[in-house]
Amino acid sequence: MAQSAEMLWIDALELDQAGDIQEALELARHIVEIDSRHSDAWMMIARLSLPPLNRGKQVMPTLAQAATSLSALRRVVQHDHDNKEAWILGGALLVDHLGMMEESLVWWEQRRDVEPREVMPLIEQIGVLIRLGIYKDAGERLEEMFSDEMEPPDNKELMGMDKVRSLVENAAKMEKDDVFRPANHKHKRWAVIDRMKTRKPVSPTLFLFTFVAPIVFLLGTVAMTLVGGSLFGFVLVFFIILGLFMVVSKFATSLLHKLNRHALDLDRALDVEMSTGKVCIPDDIRGSKLYNAMLGQRPPAFAERLEKIAEVGERLSYRWKPDLPNWMVMADADYEDEIDESEEDGPLELDGIED
C-alpha cells in the first residue's frame, strides 16, 4: 500500500536530521510528485539543492544549484505566502547568485502583496534600484520605508535601513549630474572605464591603512601631546581619537567611492548584462584586469551565467530600459528622457565598441 505524502515527509525529516542529504532530497522530490502543494517538501528541495556547510562555512552554489533552488522556492511561496525564510533565500539567489535584478524587484513586490507593512522588501528593492542607477525611485521607496505606516523593524532591519539610506545619499552625490547608463555605448563613462581598465579598484583595507590610519595617528599624537599628561587627559584623548576615526572614515568612504567610480560603473554594467541576458561591455574591457577584479568579487554562479551570456553575445539595445513593476512607470519615462538626451550628444569614439 502506497504511503501518504505526510508519512513520507516524516521519513524525509528523519533522513535530513541524520545527515543523509541525498536520500532526503530524493524523498522530498517524490513527495511533491504525490502532493504538488506540499510547501515544506518544496522548501527541503530548495535548501538541500544548495551545497551544505563545509567546516562551518557556506559553500557557494553553482549556477545549476542556484537555479534549482530558486525554482523550488517559487513553489514554496506560491503555496505558503508567509514563509519568510523562502522569500529571503529566493531574493538572495536572484540578486547575488543569478543577477536577475528586475526579477528580484518583482519578487519583493509580490512579498509586499502579502505583507505590505514589512520594511524588508523595501530594503531589498532600494538596494537593487541603486545598483541600476534609478535613484529617484529609490528615494521614494526610502521615504515610504521610514513612514509611520510601516511596522516597527527589528535590529537587523534597522541596520539595513540605515545602510540603504547611506547608499542612496552617497550614490546620488556621486552621480548627481552624470548617471551611468551602461546600455548607452556613447556614454562618456565608458571612455573613463577604458582608460582605467588596467587598474584594479582600491581596496578598502588598503585605503584604511594608507589614508585613514595615518591621519588619525597624527591627529591623535597632537592631542596626546596637548592634553594627555594625566589620566583624565588620556581618557579624553581616547575619545578624541575614536571620534576622529569615525569622522575621517566617513569622509574617506566618500573619497574611496570617487576613486573607485570606474569600478562601480563597470559593476553596474555587469548587473545590467546579467539582468537582461545581453551584452553591453566592450570586448576590449571584458577580460581586462579591472573586469576580472570586479567579476572575482561575485559568486561562482554569477560568473558562470555571465560567461554564458558573453558567449551568446546578443547586443543590448541602447534604448533599453528596465522592465520594472507597475509602481515604476515613472522610471521608464525617466529612462526614455535620458536616452533622448544622450542621442543629441556627438558620437564618442572608443575602440572595441561596435554598433
Task: Please give the residue ranges for each predicted region.
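TPR/TPR-like (Sel1-like) alpha-helical repeat modules
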Residues: 62-71, 111-114, 127-154, 166, ...
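Short coil turns that delineate tetratricopeptide repeat
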Residues: 36, 81-82, 116, 150-153
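Structural signature of tandem alpha-helical TPR/SEL1-like repeats
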Residues: 18-26, 53-72, 98-110, 133-141
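TPR alpha-solenoid repeat register
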Residues: 41, 86, 121, 154-155
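Canonical tetratricopeptide repeat
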Residues: 44, 89-90, 124
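Charged, low-complexity cytosol-facing tails and large interhelical loops of integral membrane proteins
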Residues: 4-11, 35, 269-355
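Alpha-helical segment of the N-proximal tetratricopeptide repeat
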Residues: 2-34, 44, 50-61
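Transmembrane alpha-helical hairpins and terminal membrane-anchor modules
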Residues: 198-272
